[in-house]
Amino acid sequence: MRAINNKKKLLEICKNNDIVFLAIFGSFVKGDFTEDSDIDLLARFSKPKSLLDLVRIERVLSEVLGRKTDLLTEASISPYLRERIKNEMEVVYERAG
């Protein structure tokens, strides 16, 4: 996995948006990332989020990471892909407790 720049800012985003778990998966983790690739992220929240909240958080993450992100929640993952994603993902942030 490539190093994620600005981890301090990323942790701040997680804390300010009720993210208790954030993982990266897909081409970024597998090493076949290109200039056109987005960053696939899986998030778990401590409080329910509206679609507008998710879009706003995705936009903020894209700005910090310097490229388009695709933010998914566990509930939004296809059951057919869930196991593969969980096997390849790398945890970026997990709130203790």
Predicted regions and their residues:
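Catalytic core of pol beta-like nucleotidyltransferases
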Residues: 1-23, 29-35, 46-97
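Conserved G/P- and acidic residue-centered "switch" motifs that form tight phosphate/ATP-binding loops
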Residues: 26, 40
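Short hydrophobic/aromatic beta-strand micro-patches
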Residues: 42-44
